[in-house]
């Protein structure tokens, strides 16, 4: 039974996912269906959390839109994600950056990792 589940998961896992960590600024291009139309929508922000659970892996991206914080959780191996682009590497010392929810302006900035 376990080998069957493992085999199915192996087929579903995407291979073209770039390596990114918490604190990185990424752009996620997602397919959006509106009525009968299908288009690509871009969501760019800072990765504040990553949950690695094989096929059930997910990551949370936060951005500020019109002065309001917007967070979106993406399933890493979802078919709705077209591509993930890493724009900037962030230098952080924590895995979960939930403290950014309470910060605004310059206090919410993250230093850039140079390597």
Curated annotation (Swiss-Prot):
Transmembrane segments: none annotated. GO terms for cellular component: cytosolic large ribosomal subunit. Coiled coil: none annotated. Gene3D superfamilies: 2.30.30.790. InterPro entries: Ribosomal_bL19, Ribosomal_bL19_CS, Ribosomal_bL19_sf, Translation_prot_SH3-like_sf. GO terms for biological process: translation. SUPFAM superfamilies: Translation proteins SH3-like domain (SSF50104). Keywords: Ribonucleoprotein, Ribosomal protein. It comes from the Bacteria. One of its GO terms (molecular function) is structural constituent of ribosome. This protein is located at the 30S-50S ribosomal subunit interface and may play a role in the structure and function of the aminoacyl-tRNA binding site. Belongs to the bacterial ribosomal protein bL19 family. NCBIfam families: rplS_bact (TIGR01024). HAMAP family: Ribosomal_bL19. This is Large ribosomal subunit protein bL19. It comes from Buchnera aphidicola subsp. Acyrthosiphon pisum (strain 5A). The gene is rplS.
């Amino acid at each position: 039974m376990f080998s069957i589940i493992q085999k199915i998961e192996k087929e579903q896992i995407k291979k073209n996912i770039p390596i990114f960590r918490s604190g990185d600024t990424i752009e996620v291009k997602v397919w959006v269906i509106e009525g009968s139309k299908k288009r690509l929508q871009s969501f760019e922000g800072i990765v504040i959390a990553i949950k690695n659970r094989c096929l059930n892996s997910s990551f949370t991206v936060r951005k500020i839109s019109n002065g309001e914080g917007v967070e979106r959780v993406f399933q890493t191996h979802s078919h709705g994600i077209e591509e993930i682009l890493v724009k900037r590497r962030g230098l952080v010392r924590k895995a979960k950056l939930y403290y950014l929810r309470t910060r605004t302006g310059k206090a919410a900035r993250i230093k850039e990792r140079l390597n």
